[in-house]
Regions:
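Vicinal oxygen chelate
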Residues: 1-4, 25-71, 81-108, 119-129
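Conserved beta-strand-loop-alpha-helix junction that forms the acyl-donor binding cleft
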Residues: 10-13
């Protein structure tokens, strides 16, 4: 089995597509009802409620999720923080080294979906300083 995409349901496809276009530096492909943004390792799909209603009208609500984090591995978290400072309204977590060996920052998209940009950092071997 292969994960094809993570889909975000929104009230405004254009606003969310423009945000992710800036964040991911990829062009959205699609229409006002559904777009895809393909990265080197996966795809983010953005759709309006009308496209979800085709499957089942009660299947998803726009901007109702507070339990999923979209993780993106980047080369340099601090450079990404500088690049995104005018686009992102609030950073939930400024670039911070994590005990599991990554440097992470967290922020939200216009619908409130949580995004984690992280990069791997070297950790000292156990027992060494």
């Amino acid at each position: 089995m292969k994960l094809a995409s993570a889909r975000l349901v929104t009230k405004d496809v254009n606003v969310l597509a423009k945000f992710y276009q800036e964040v991911l530096r990829v062009e959205p492909i699609g229409s006002e009802c559904y777009v895809e943004l393909a990265t080197t390792s996966g795809m983010i799909a953005i759709s309006s409620k009308c496209s979800v209603d085709i499957f089942n009208a009660a299947a998803a609500e726009p901007a109702a999720n507070r339990s999923v984090i979209l993780d993106f591995e980047v080369e340099d978290v601090d450079q990404e923080r500088d690049r995104l400072h005018n686009l992102v309204g609030e950073f939930i977590l400024e670039p911070t080294d994590q005990p599991w060996g990554t440097r992470s920052m967290l922020f939200r998209d216009p619908d409130g979906n949580l995004i984690n940009f992280f990069s791997k950092v070297s950790r000292p071997e156990s027992g060494k300083t």
